[in-house]
């Protein structure tokens, strides 16, 4: 699996046509996932309950797609175990993120939640056993500098936000585990099958947590929840899951940084949250990084 991923990245991401479509799918998946925070804010249920409905509404469609994809064949026991483990990581990630975002500033939650990007980049370097050089190194620098500009202005360190900050950080760590497990299981499972199994595991965990926290479960307005299931779970996670085995954790980590940039734009459009010149420049830096990471690169120096 690792050898396959490394060879793809070294050859500019795969055969040209497949590589382009796979990278576009990875970006489109992250853009769809970016809308999730906006829709969670619009939902009239509790935060964990909205995550439950995201899964529950999407699940019948995911299972139908998985059945069609697999022809009704039962996956291997090992694949089911790995996909189920990914589902546990993802459910706990959603719980930590949705609760944490209510106990800290949005900028803090976004900053700490996106530690998954840094962790995936570090893991990608560890797997390759080589330091990034050339365009790849510049892309990493631009991506994280741009994200710091996007989130740094509104970030605030305070004891009042400690619990929320720690929960958001935990969410980022859990999401890293989810991505790596899904990337692993995609070596043996098709995308909808892997996503369907992980989603089945998520549903009872999220419902049980929402009930334990005494959240409002039943919505009055279904529109935000239906859109959340469509954009974040079916489209966003569907595209992400399909593209995962085609790229290294390093590339996947960098594309995750699209999410805070798009979230800032969505906040401006939906809630009138101001975007200053620094925010715009930070978004442009992230965009430039995504272009550079696809350019041919010199062979990196061994670690």
PLM region spans:
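Hydrophobic transmembrane alpha-helices of multi-pass small-molecule transport proteins
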Residues: 62, 66, 84, 90, ...
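C-terminal-most transmembrane helix of multi-pass membrane proteins
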Residues: 3-12, 54-55, 153, 221, ...
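Loop-to-transmembrane-helix transition segments
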Residues: 21-31, 53, 72-96, 138-141, ...
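Helix-helix packing/entry segments at the starts of transmembrane helices
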Residues: 109-115, 181-202, 233-269
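Glycine-/small-residue-enriched transmembrane alpha-helix faces in small-molecule transporters
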Residues: 2-52, 85-88, 96, 157-184, ...
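Transmembrane alpha-helical segments that form core, pore/gating elements
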Residues: 38-39, 62, 120-126, 140, ...
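Specific alpha-helical transmembrane segments that line the substrate/conduction pathway
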Residues: 49-60, 98-131, 136, 171, ...
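Loop-to-transmembrane alpha-helix entry segments
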Residues: 77, 81, 110-113, 129-149, ...
């Amino acid at each position: 699996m690792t050898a396959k991923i490394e060879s793809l990245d070294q050859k500019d991401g795969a055969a040209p046509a497949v590589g382009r479509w796979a990278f576009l799918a990875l970006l489109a998946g992250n853009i769809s996932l970016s809308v999730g925070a906006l829709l969670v804010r619009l939902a009239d249920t509790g935060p964990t309950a909205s995550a439950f409905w995201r899964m529950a509404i999407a699940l019948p469609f995911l299972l139908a797609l998985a059945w069609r994809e697999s022809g009704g064949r039962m996956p291997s026991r090992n694949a089911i175990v790995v996909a189920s483990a990914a589902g546990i990581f993802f459910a706990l990630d959603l719980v930590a993120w949705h609760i944490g975002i209510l106990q800290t500033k949005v900028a803090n939650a976004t900053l700490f939640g996106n530690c998954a990007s840094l962790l995936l980049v570090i893991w990608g370097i560890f797997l390759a056993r080589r330091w990034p050089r050339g365009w790849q190194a510049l892309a990493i620098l631009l991506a994280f500098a741009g994200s710091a500009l996007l989130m740094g202005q509104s970030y605030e360190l305070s004891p009042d936000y400690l619990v929320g900050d720690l929960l958001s950080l935990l969410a980022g760590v859990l999401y890293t585990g989810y991505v790596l497990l899904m990337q692993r299981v995609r070596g043996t499972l098709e995308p909808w099958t892997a996503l369907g199994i992980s989603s089945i595991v998520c549903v009872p965990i999220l419902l049980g947590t929402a009930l334990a926290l005494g959240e409002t479960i039943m919505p009055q307005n279904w529109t935000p929840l239906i859109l959340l299931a469509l954009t974040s779970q079916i489209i966003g996670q569907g595209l992400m899951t399909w593209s995962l085995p085609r790229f290294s954790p390093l590339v996947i980590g960098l594309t995750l940084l699209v999410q805070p940039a798009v979230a800032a734009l969505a906040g401006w459009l939906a809630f009138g949250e101001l975007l200053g010149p620094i925010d715009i420049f930070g978004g442009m830096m992230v965009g430039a990084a995504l272009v550079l990471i696809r350019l041919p690169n010199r062979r990196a120096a061994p670690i």
